[in-house]
């Protein structure tokens, strides 16, 4: 098993257990404890895990972005449930904005089953996946984000998106506060989502429970600005909102 594959599997296991010992990871992966320790040291240096005496857990800091290959393992079962609920709100012939989040990628995996959908995305991974199927897909172009290698950002991306109007915008963020505000730590990605939100008739936020009751650096939007929030937890009591029907439990 290559180093990158080991690191992906470590993150996947920690996503399931929240906390694990070196011995547990060694046994589950059939890899020596010394190799596990080296991998954990590298992951900690990259800000992806927190080590303590005898154990390790995923870092919770919202100021750092976990690479897409690892984020796609985080809460993957919950994200797939959320994606199914989101896909049910997308209809034949819809034009769909997808952002570069791992949550939106799981929605992309379901779109080939919906007839006549057109997708506009700044996600390299989503565009690559959809290119294998009969789904009309437009990749925005732009600069590869230095922080999140899986998405395209910058002025060219924004100019492209401003010229397009969609039926649905599907997106996620890093943090959602109790007062209904959404946040992310990267200004470039916030700017892109702002255009998607503005130019879509219907807006869907994908929000697994790990994002709740948190804030990050840059304000993105408010629940008042969107039609649906889909989560793996019941949000009717989380938000003080007079329109609870916008919250969908996946």
Residue ranges and their predicted role:
Residues 2-5, 12, 19-23, 30, ...:
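Conserved phosphate- and dinucleotide-binding cores of soluble alpha/beta proteins
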Residues 2-9, 13-28, 34-100, 108-116, ...:
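HTH-adjacent hinge/linker in prokaryotic transcriptional regulators
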Residues 104:
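Conserved SAM/SAH-binding loop
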């Amino acid at each position: 098993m290559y180093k990158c594959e080991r690191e992906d599997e470590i993150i996947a296991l920690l996503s399931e257990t929240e906390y694990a010992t070196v011995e547990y990871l060694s046994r589950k992966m059939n890899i020596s404890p010394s190799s596990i320790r080296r991998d954990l040291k590298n992951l900690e240096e990259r800000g992806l895990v927190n080590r303590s005496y005898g154990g390790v857990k995923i870092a919770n800091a919202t100021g750092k972005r976990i690479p897409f290959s690892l984020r796609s393992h985080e809460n993957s079962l919950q994200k797939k449930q959320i994606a199914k609920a989101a896909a049910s709100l997308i209809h034949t012939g819809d034009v769909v904005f997808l952002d570069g989040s791992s949550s939106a990628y799981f929605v992309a995996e379901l779109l080939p089953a919906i007839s006549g959908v057109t997708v506009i995305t700044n996600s390299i991974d989503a565009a690559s996946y959809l290119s294998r199927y009969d789904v009309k897909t437009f990749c925005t172009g732009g600069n590869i984000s230095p922080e999140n290698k899986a998405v395209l950002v910058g002025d060219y991306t924004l100019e492209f998106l401003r010229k397009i109007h969609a039926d649905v915008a599907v997106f996620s963020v890093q943090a959602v506060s109790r007062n209904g505000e959404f946040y992310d730590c990267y200004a470039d990605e916030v700017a892109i989502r702002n255009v998607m939100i503005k130019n879509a008739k219907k807006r869907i936020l994908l929000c697994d429970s790990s994002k709740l009751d948190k804030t990050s650096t840059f304000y993105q939007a408010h629940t008042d600005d969107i039609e649906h929030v889909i989560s793996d937890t019941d949000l009717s009591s989380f938000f003080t909102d007079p329109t609870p029907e916008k919250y969908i439990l996946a």
